Amino acid sequence: MTQPEFKLKKNVKTLLDEAAAKTKGISAEAAQEKLGDDHTVFVDIRDVRELERDGMIPGAFHAPRGMLEFWVDPESKYYKPVFVPGKAYILYCAADWRATLAAGVLAEMGMSQIYHLEGGFEEWKKAGRPVGQRPHSPHKPKA
């Protein structure tokens, strides 16, 4: 594949580095210790097709990457009350790139205690950590 004739102001690596500097990573081992903790919310930001295909961390809240900022903002008509002050949030995606970027944005929005799962869900599964199935919406029949 040939390289395009232009340069971006910031490339993906720069964006990831900037986001990582604003947030904290958490290992799969340390994250597993937080499972079931009332003050910690696991947030799966993967596409719904990934959840259907690969499962998810048991008890995680699914917030699609494209809606996350809207669901976090209490001034948005899309706000979800799972996002409240005083809780820790562990964001994850497949490999940790989207989660790192998302965690950086949430930190910019003023949220604290935001973590991204190092290595993402792939690392979580590879280490033999618990995996559950995506809960189906009560409004849609199972296929």
What are these regions (language model features)?
Residues 92:
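Short, surface-exposed ligand- or partner-binding patches at beta-edge/loop junctions that are enriched
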Residues 43:
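Active-site flanking residues adjacent to catalytic metal/cofactor-binding acidic residues
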Residues 1-40, 48-88, 97-143:
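Rhodanese-like catalytic fold shared by cysteine-dependent sulfurtransferases
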